[in-house]
Amino acid sequence: MSEFNFISRLHNRGLISHITNEDNLSKLIENKSISLYCGFDPTEESLHIGHLLPLIMLKRFQIAGHRPIILIGGATSLIGDPSFKEKERVFNSNYNVNIWTEKITKQISCFLDFNCGKNSAVLLNNNTWFKQINILSFLRDVGKYFSVNTMINRAAVKQRITRPDQGISFTEFSYNLLQAYDFFILNQQYQVDLQIGGADQWGNISSGMHLIHRKTKRVVYGLTVPLLIQSNGIKFGKTESGTVWLDSNKTSPYKFYQFWMNIEDANVYYFLKLFTFIKVSEINKLEKNKNINNQIINDKSLLAKHITQLVHGKEKLLAAERITKFLFLKNTTHIEESDLQQLKQDGIPFIEVSNVKDLQEALVLTSLAQSRTQAKNMIISNSISINTEKIRKNHIFHEKDKLFGKFTLLSRGKKQHSLLCW
């Protein structure tokens, strides 16, 4: 197999966890444009960064000339995928699923090109076909092709069945068949030859391939991207403050940008290969020079920049960079009023004030100091800044301290901040 073909390039970036019939799939996609799909169940009002790799994989295939199909699980989300879940999901209402579907559809739309000719992206909802099938038809036309013994022994289900405190309901157990039917319908109606997903979807993808082969004798393919786990064993994208969402109203572009700036050093160059479109040869050069002048910090910034722009766009990336420079590089030149409003929304402690006179009082009010005495000592020890400027003696506030006439940023060291809102 040529080292320059598409599948080899995906391997070179570490993007493939599982793949079926690799040689045949590689020949297929080198010789013609194929249709592939990935499903997303709207079980929340936003996707999170755990969904990024499959989305970016679809984008890579589209750039290579193939047609990506996004399948929104309007029906399957009413059941919930039990794969590797420790306990049964809480059912979502039709009302919530419909609202979440609209929101997630808008999020996904910015990743792919829906107007580029023959390989334009397609957006579908599996509720379209599931609302037309009855239970007896489904059991006769789909269920008869599956062995319960095989289904029980799939790793995604087995861990639930073997736990004494948790079983699995027939409802969740049937999810595997529903997703298999999705693949079958897409193969029949949209000529889909490949399903992609996260590594935890391998069992569901395999079931779809099995169903298609049993019913039609056709050969189709599956490919999964790796599941990313942090060194503490927690899934990538989970932080102490919660999930990192793609929706800017749930995780601001600034917080999103900072998440990537704070990843473990060991992951920087791997993630550049996974999440960006920078050439592997260029990434390897960056890694070779990572210890020169602390270059790895710049490389983290490069990663954060590429992914933030991909998810949130250029304008919100620039705002995230302005806030970062303001807080960490003491650069107030280009800060905008909306950036400070964003800081307030992002959870930086703030208090509404009107008649605070001096810095010591403000430090106590914001809990950056426990007493005026402690505040005085912190000021003397050069630990306190006003709008990123170090203060060495008690300070009486003036209008010039109020950015845009409204905000004063107090900082204790590099990481503790509080915003005075006048």
Curated annotation (Swiss-Prot):
EC numbers for this chain: 6.1.1.1
Residue numbers binding ATP: K238
Compartment list: Cytoplasm
Protein's UniProt name: Tyrosine--tRNA ligase
Motif 'HIGH' region: chain residues: 42-51
Pfam families attached to this UniProt entry: SYY_C-terminal, tRNA-synt_1b
Organism whose genome encodes this protein: Buchnera aphidicola subsp. Acyrthosiphon pisum (strain Tuc7)
Function description: Catalyzes the attachment of tyrosine to tRNA(Tyr) in a two-step reaction: tyrosine is first activated by ATP to form Tyr-AMP and then transferred to the acceptor end of tRNA(Tyr).
GO molecular function: ATP binding; RNA binding; tyrosine-tRNA ligase activity
Alphabetized CDD domains for the sequence: TyrRS_core (cd00805)
Lineage top rank: taxon: Bacteria
Keyword Lipid metabolism recorded: no
InterPro entries: aa-tRNA-synth_Ic (IPR002305), Rossmann-like_a/b/a_fold (IPR014729), S4_RNA-bd_sf (IPR036986), SYY-like_C (IPR054608), Tyr-tRNA-ligase (IPR002307), Tyr-tRNA-ligase_bac-type (IPR024088), Tyr-tRNA-ligase_bac_1 (IPR024107)
Gene3D superfamilies the UniProt entry points to: HUPs, RNA-binding S4 domain, Tyrosyl-Transfer RNA Synthetase
Similarity comment text for this entry: Belongs to the class-I aminoacyl-tRNA synthetase family. TyrS type 1 subfamily.
Catalytic activity from the UniProt record: tRNA(Tyr) + L-tyrosine + ATP = L-tyrosyl-tRNA(Tyr) + AMP + diphosphate + H(+)
Residues that hold L-tyrosine according to the record: Y37, Y175, Q179
Domain S4 RNA-binding: 357-414
PANTHER family: TYROSINE--TRNA LIGASE, MITOCHONDRIAL, TYROSYL-TRNA SYNTHETASE
Subunit annotation: Homodimer.
UniProt keyword list: Aminoacyl-tRNA synthetase, ATP-binding, Cytoplasm, Ligase, Nucleotide-binding, Protein biosynthesis, RNA-binding
Residues spanned by motif 'KMSKS' region: 235-239
Lineage of source species: Bacteria, Pseudomonadati, Pseudomonadota, Gammaproteobacteria, Enterobacterales
GO cellular component: cytosol
One GO-annotated biological process of the protein: tyrosyl-tRNA aminoacylation
Keyword Lipid biosynthesis included in the entry's annotation: no
Coiled-coil region: none
